[in-house]
Amino acid sequence: EDMKNAEKFIFMEYHAIEDEEAWHRIQKILEDRVKAGVEVRVFYDDMGSIGFVNMDFARKLESVGIKCRVFNPFSPGFNMFLNNRDHRKITVIDGKVGYTGGYNLANEYSNITHPYGMWKDTGVRMEGDAVRSLTVAFLEMWNAASNAHPDEIDMEQYLQPHPYQAKQNGYIQPYADSPLDGEQVGEEVYISMINKAEKYCWFMTPYLIITDEMAHALSLAAKRGVDVRIITPGIPDKKLIYSVTRSFYNGLVINGVRIFEWTPGFCHAKMCVVDDCMATCGTINMDYRSLYHHFENGCFMAGCDVVLDIRHDLEHTISKCRDVPDQSKAGRSA
């Protein structure tokens, strides 16, 4: 509905787009908005969309008036940045409404197909000043992806303030992470939340391949009495990565961290909630690629009612999980 009501612009940036049913529904809306005079830009990662779209996908979008750019196209020659992928997921509508989360624009994310059992993902819809941060993140990547001059002479035209009646207490702060600036923002947010936890710290992540620093922070939190839990998938999308993920279990479990595997299928959500007071949701997996190699984004929430919604979602998810220690699977590389 938000896209259908767009009046000025729609910006969409995703790691993967699949040229199938889920995307076709969105594309129909985008084409209708273009006909109504709305500026539409679509930006996707080339490697993330390999096998999902044809080589002429971007050209077809351009032919119907949708501006399209592809991030870091794959080529057979040497590319020192090949490993740096755009893993962000952002939609901005008129600068008034923004979306981010774990989902890409493909059938499995909408549970139209079920290659790995049920698919669980999460996202955040936001209004107000926070949307401006998503707009800036999108435009920076869009302009960096081309040697041409920026499409906009003045970025401020997309950053105009809009009247907004606050619906939540507290605040939300979107943030972006880049592998090129020497700052590991995603990891620093996670570790900061772990270190501030007093009662509980719960994570959901599709992969668990962490640095010694993060493993140490999780273990210390558990040892000081914090209820530390991590939810991972019960059905893997990549068996090798699943084995590596499970290899990290034992070192955490023996220090008091509880691991849960979601039995209905694959949980692709990336969330953390702490002490009913703060949470984060976005694109950042608890793995080395997300934390060090990819362009990522997330949103930090503090003092918002939605923090409790996230806790309740994690509680419901845990009710459908197997407790790894109880199943005596800690440290096994099945």
Task: Name every feature range the model reports, one short phrase each.
Residues 1-334:
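Charged, low-complexity intrinsically disordered terminal segments
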